[in-house]
């Protein structure tokens, strides 16, 4: 078995030209990939995305674990994107960062790609403990301004800091922390917490299975969110078009601006929306079970016999707010 010293790569000072396939020891360093649309694949480890200083994508690789020597790195154009792929040995992967009693399973192609929806590849299981290949890869990715990146990570954590470009993140069991992004952002996450701050772009799309979502200072033309379970908090939101669909968990939304359309469908959990005092919208609330409380002047107010629905006009009625809540209180308050 290699010593721990040989398993941890030494980051080279010079930037290396990346061949198609390298052993992990030789691949240690920072690499440049030319293009405008990139895809990065990594099964286990941390991925940090930062602002790049040039015209090319840069990727720094640090291999971890007793079996890190079995990792390989591959590049090249696949499906119209310039790719950087960490290829793991066959068999189960042990990644302690997942947690001792946790595991995730997916299908991985021989070229190291996964989660592209066609369901092909070998079965790979990643566990937090037990027997298997003990290896992971930590990546630091520098994204040039104005470029697009599709990031795939099965287990670990993703952080994004002060990036100017379009970003799509697809993670299995991995936390996501974004602080500073100017561009479109798409997230597809299985389970793990999501934190977003200082986002400004055309579209923001979030699809999560389970885990909390906390966002602050978010500005986008259109925002869509689909959450299976977990509390959702969106604070300081500027958008004219919002669509939120949550299965279970409390929803808190603080709007900075007027809206054209807000649609919110909540299975269970309380819904609290803070709006500007001059917001104008036609309001339609179906509360299911739970109280409905609107603490703003409401014109043309009407409700059914059981008081589990409410309709009316806020302000000039320019926009539209539609809320469908299965169970839990619904409150609309002045910000």
Identify the residue ranges that each predicted region occupies.
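Intrinsically disordered, low-complexity terminal regions
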Residues: 1-335
């Amino acid at each position: 078995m290699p010593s721990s010293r040989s398993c941890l790569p030494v980051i080279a000072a010079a930037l290396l030209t990346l061949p198609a396939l390298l052993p992990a020891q030789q691949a240690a360093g920072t690499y440049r990939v030319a293009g405008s649309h990139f895809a990065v694949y990594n099964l286990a480890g941390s991925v940090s995305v930062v602002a790049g200083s040039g015209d090319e994508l840069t990727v720094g690789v640090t291999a971890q674990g007793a079996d890190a020597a079995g990792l390989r790195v591959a590049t090249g154009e696949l499906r119209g994107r310039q790719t950087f792929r960490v290829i793991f040995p066959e068999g189960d992967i042990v990644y302690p960062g997942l947690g001792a009693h946790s595991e995730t399973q997916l299908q991985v192609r021989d070229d190291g790609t996964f989660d592209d929806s066609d369901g092909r590849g070998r079965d790979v299981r990643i566990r937090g403990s037990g027997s298997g290949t003990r290896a992971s890869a930590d990546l630091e990715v520098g994204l040039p301004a104005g470029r697009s990146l599709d990031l795939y990570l099965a287990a670990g954590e993703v952080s994004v800091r002060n990036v100017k470009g379009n970003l799509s993140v697809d993670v299995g069991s991995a936390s996501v922390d974004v602080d500073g992004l100017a561009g479109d952002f798409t997230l597809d996450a299985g389970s793990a917490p999501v934190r977003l701050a200082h986002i400004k772009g055309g579209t923001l799309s979030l699809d999560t299975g389970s885990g909390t979502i906390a966002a602050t200072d978010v500005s986008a033309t259109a925002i869509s969110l689909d959450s299976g379970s977990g509390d959702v908090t969106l604070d300081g939101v500027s958008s004219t078009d919002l669509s939120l669909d949550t299965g279970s968990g409390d929803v808190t939304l603080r709007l900075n601006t007027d809206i054209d359309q807000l649609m919110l469908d909540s299975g269970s959990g309380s819904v609290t929306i803070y709006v500007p005092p001059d917001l104008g919208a036609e309001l339609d609330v179906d509360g299911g079970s739970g109280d409905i409380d609107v603490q703003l002047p409401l014109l043309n107010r009407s409700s059914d016999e059981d008081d589990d629905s409410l309709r009316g006009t806020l302000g000039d009625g320019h926009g539209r707010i539609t809320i469908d809540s299965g169970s839990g209180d619904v409150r609309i308050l002045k910000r």
